């Protein structure tokens, strides 16, 4: 923070980044409010949201991954669409992109999603 004192926010993109960012900020001489966002709903990350060290955690809806995978496998095996050779561009019942949604956790909604943390 000494090199870039105008930094207003830092984002982390894996489950360990929130801890690393907050540890780095605690050990720096930063004297202004720096917004922190990170990925993955992990217990340590939720505690950092609760303490106010992290502003937002973005979580994936992991249960939806399994649902869509099972649904697509079912469609492959029970669809009227024939999947002959996907490598040569035949029609597929599997979409190119599947949006599974995200959960945004902050101090305002933390206990709504995780009431046992109260």
Tell me the role of every PLM-derived stretch.
Residues 5-8, 56-59, 100:
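Second-shell loop/turn segments in exported
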Residues 33, 53-54, 101:
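A generic structural signal for alpha->beta connector loops
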Residues 27-28, 64-67:
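A ligand-binding cleft/hinge motif common to bilobed small-molecule-binding domains
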Residues 40, 61, 108:
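Residues at the C-termini of beta-strands that transition into short coil/loop
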Residues 1-48:
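Hydrophobic alpha-helical
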Residues 51-63:
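Short beta-strand elements at the ligand-binding edges of bilobed clamshell
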Residues 68-118:
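Hinge/cleft segment of the Venus flytrap/periplasmic-binding protein
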Residues 46-47, 66-70:
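Short, charged, surface-exposed secondary-structure boundary motifs
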